């Protein structure tokens, strides 16, 4: 939640989407090669990110690999591209096993194309490229984690009921969206009143063991107060208050595709991961050469329609030399926060939807 909160502060009126699973997986790979204070910071941060995962679902190596049986439509993959000019330690290579490949970073264009092709393949063609800028001549290693999720709704929306409706970007700005309609579905729902405002939470299940949770403020511009006040603990408490209601749900079809990846370096530094960047970085368990994290890139894609939700995310790290009851009607027609989660306790994706793209 903390990375998401930092991002939405920087992107106030923009659509935001991240995959905590992808980010954590990348940090875990870095931790395999970290030593000293760098390892201490990474281990502590990974432990904090992993706090809300049930003990029996945690990985002994702190890798956030989501169990396929628990979320059958989720695919995760990691890849480490290391310079063929560096001799990496055998102990590090043993930990990352088949996910490592040597490349020639001096042949920058060929290596860039190779990496982007892997990203495209792992995300089922939904993210065509992670690397949009030329590679630095100082690049020594790139760590990438890709997540692709596609799930059918348990209660599909009827296509013939989809219609054009208003979506309020703010009180003064209105646009139109394709509004999907789901009728007479038994969904988990709660309305919460907090000091900072009222809002509804609705849990919309997919086939299998995953769902999309939407937090919809009562006020058209109420999302800003939720952004400021939401925490993992509060969200867990609110979800514990959900109960089954018969609901007619009106929800926009939406698609979010990023034009440029986020560079998470400043955010991770703000959150205490200062010793993986710059002079104090210690990745001596990877190799004898002094290397540090130069960029921490993260990009995502989501497509929500009547039949399914499809989401992809990629995180990349560049190392260089120095997410019978009466029927209610719920209209999702203004900015909201959404999460996709599985029943293992993992938040696969978390986002904010402000306007149609």
UniProtKB/Swiss-Prot annotation:
<dbReference type="GO" id="GO:0030430">
    <property type="term" value="C:host cell cytoplasm"/>
</dbReference>
<keyword id="KW-1035">Host cytoplasm</keyword>
<comment type="function">
    <text>Plays a role in mediating viral host range. May act to inhibit a caspase independent form of apoptosis to allow efficient virus replication in infected cells.</text>
</comment>
<dbReference type="GO" id="GO:0005615">
    <property type="term" value="C:extracellular space"/>
</dbReference>
<dbReference type="InterPro" id="IPR000215">
    <property type="entry name" value="Serpin_fam"/>
</dbReference>
<dbReference type="InterPro" id="IPR042178">
    <property type="entry name" value="Serpin_sf_1"/>
</dbReference>
<dbReference type="InterPro" id="IPR023795">
    <property type="entry name" value="Serpin_CS"/>
</dbReference>
<dbReference type="Pfam" id="PF00079">
    <property type="entry name" value="Serpin"/>
</dbReference>
<dbReference type="InterPro" id="IPR036186">
    <property type="entry name" value="Serpin_sf"/>
</dbReference>
<dbReference type="GO" id="GO:0004867">
    <property type="term" value="F:serine-type endopeptidase inhibitor activity"/>
</dbReference>
<dbReference type="InterPro" id="IPR023796">
    <property type="entry name" value="Serpin_dom"/>
</dbReference>
<dbReference type="InterPro" id="IPR042185">
    <property type="entry name" value="Serpin_sf_2"/>
</dbReference>
<protein>
    <recommendedName>
        <fullName>Serine proteinase inhibitor 1</fullName>
    </recommendedName>
</protein>
<comment type="similarity">
    <text>Belongs to the serpin family. Poxviruses subfamily.</text>
</comment>
């Amino acid at each position: 939640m903390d990375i998401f909160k930092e991002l939405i502060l920087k992107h106030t009126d923009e659509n935001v989407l991240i995959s905590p699973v992808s980010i954590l997986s990348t940090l875990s790979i870095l931790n395999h090669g970290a030593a000293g204070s760098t390892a201490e910071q990474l281990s502590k941060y990974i432990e904090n990110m992993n706090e809300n995962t049930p003990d029996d679902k945690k990985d002994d190596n702190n890798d956030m690999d989501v169990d396929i049986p628990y979320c059958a439509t989720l695919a995760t993959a990691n890849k480490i591209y290391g310079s063929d000019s560096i001799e990496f330690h055998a102990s590090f290579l043993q930990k990352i096993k088949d996910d490592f490949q040597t490349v020639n970073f001096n042949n920058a264009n060929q290596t860039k194309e190779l990496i982007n092709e892997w990203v495209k393949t792992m995300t089922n063609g939904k993210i065509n490229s992670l690397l949009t800028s030329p590679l630095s001549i100082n690049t020594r290693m790139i760590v990438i984690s890709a997540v692709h999720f596609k799930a059918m709704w348990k209660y599909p929306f009827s296509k013939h009921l989809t219609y054009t409706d208003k979506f309020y970007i703010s009180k003064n700005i209105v646009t139109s969206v394709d509004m999907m309609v789901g009728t007479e579905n038994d969904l988990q729902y709660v309305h919460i009143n907090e000091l900072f405002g009222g809002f509804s939470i609705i849990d919309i299940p997919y086939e299998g063991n995953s769902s999309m949770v939407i937090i919809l403020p009562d006020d058209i511009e109420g999302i800003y107060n939720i952004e400021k006040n939401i925490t993992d603990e509060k969200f867990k408490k609110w979800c514990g208050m959900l109960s089954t209601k018969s609901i007619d749900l009106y929800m926009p079809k939406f698609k979010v595709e990023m034009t440029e990846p986020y560079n998470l370096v400043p955010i991770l530094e703000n959150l205490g991961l200062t010793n993986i960047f710059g002079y104090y970085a210690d990745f001596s368990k990877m190799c004898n050469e002094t290397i540090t994290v130069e960029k921490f890139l993260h990009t995502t894609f989501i497509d929500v329609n009547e039949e399914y939700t499809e989401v992809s995310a990629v995180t990349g790290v560049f190392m260089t030399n120095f997410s019978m009851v009466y029927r209610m009607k719920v209209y999702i027609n203004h900015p909201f926060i959404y999460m996709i989660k599985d029943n293992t306790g993992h938040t696969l994706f978390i986002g904010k939807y402000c306007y149609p793209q």
